[in-house]
Amino acid sequence: MQQLQNVIENAFERRAEITPANADTVTREAVNQVIALLDSGALRVAEKIDGQWVTHQWLKKAVLLSFRINDNKVMDGAETRYYDKVPMKFADYDEARFQKEGFRVVPPATVRQGAFIARNTVLMPSYVNIGAYVDEGSMVDTWATVGSCAQIGKNVHLSGGVGIGGVLEPLQANPTIIEDNCFIGARSEVVEGVIVEEGSVISMGVYLGQSTRIYDRETGEVHYGRVPAGSVVVSGNLPSKDGSYSLYCAVIVKKVDAKTRGKVGINELLRTID
């Protein structure tokens, strides 16, 4: 694996010179191998090690290099044709392979090659970009987008129109991460490498980026870039120091543990916020 990483790192240093016409065989094979390993879930761009999320930057570099070494080509879809550098993940799947891998894909959901979809996942008409990882038992609902290299945990529900930001455009240092057992409400956006920790509930229409203030009304603490585990979060505003205006924020209205989540439905958690 170290040899593979070295090839990717060296190629990335001269990426501006690489084109589909001049990409050497060693680089091309290394990039294709990484994309295949990401596609199968054998590798992932970020993983939790000793309780901390670690980003494997070289894998992200391999994803970026794949755009340098591949030319656009015509691809056939169910209702149209496509012209792109990245093949569709399911282009060569037959019924036996879908059954073996154990997830559902509702037309016209689109998944790019290099994204991993785990068992018991349901993809409604949605979009999952290259390098993303969607773990077991999750639902990607209608018109939701899972951005490049984003990490989605087990038993996560991404509601209709949710946007989970990617790392490639604009280039970000770390992927956006939604940990296990989270609920992201309709039309919410989580971007710029924000981490939503395990068991959190994000209400409809909440926007979270690195500069978004995440205000805990119980403690008065303000978080940036991280929603603490078990938080129930809604949209809000915080006043300026002189009270002349207010600016958008996200508000942690309560904390819940796994036992409470198991007994109480998501809707009830969001409705009883007083």
UniProtKB/Swiss-Prot annotation:
GO molecular function: 2,3,4,5-tetrahydropyridine-2,6-dicarboxylate N-succinyltransferase activity; nucleotidyltransferase activity
Pfam families tied to this protein: Hexapep_2, THDPS_N_2
Residues at which substrate binds: R104, D141
Primary location class: cytoplasm
InterPro entries: DapD_Trfase_Hexpep_rpt_fam (IPR005664), Hexapep (IPR001451), Hexapep_transf_CS (IPR018357), THP_succinylTrfase_dom1 (IPR023180), THP_succinylTrfase_N_sf (IPR037133), Trimer_LpxA-like_sf (IPR011004)
Gene Ontology cellular-component terms listed: cytoplasm
Keyword match Transferase: yes
Swiss-Prot/TrEMBL keywords: Acyltransferase, Amino-acid biosynthesis, Cytoplasm, Diaminopimelate biosynthesis, Lysine biosynthesis, Repeat, Transferase
Pathway(s) annotated for this protein in UniProt: Amino-acid biosynthesis; L-lysine biosynthesis via DAP pathway; LL-2,6-diaminopimelate from (S)-tetrahydrodipicolinate (succinylase route): step 1/3
GO BP field: diaminopimelate biosynthetic process; lysine biosynthetic process via diaminopimelate
Amino-acid biosynthesis is among the record's keywords: yes
Bilayer-spanning residue ranges: none
CDD domains on file: LbH_THP_succinylT
Localization, UniProt: Cytoplasm
Catalytic activity: (S)-2,3,4,5-tetrahydrodipicolinate + succinyl-CoA + H2O = (S)-2-succinylamino-6-oxoheptanedioate + CoA
PROSITE patterns, sorted: HEXAPEP_TRANSFERASES (PS00101)
Signal sequence extent: none
Entry EC number(s): 2.3.1.117
Family: Belongs to the transferase hexapeptide repeat family.
PANTHER family xrefs: 2,3,4,5-TETRAHYDROPYRIDINE-2,6-DICARBOXYLATE N-SUCCINYLTRANSFERASE, MOLYBDENUM COFACTOR GUANYLYLTRANSFERASE
Assembly and binders: Homotrimer.
Protein name: 2,3,4,5-tetrahydropyridine-2,6-dicarboxylate N-succinyltransferase
Protein species of origin: Serratia proteamaculans (strain 568)
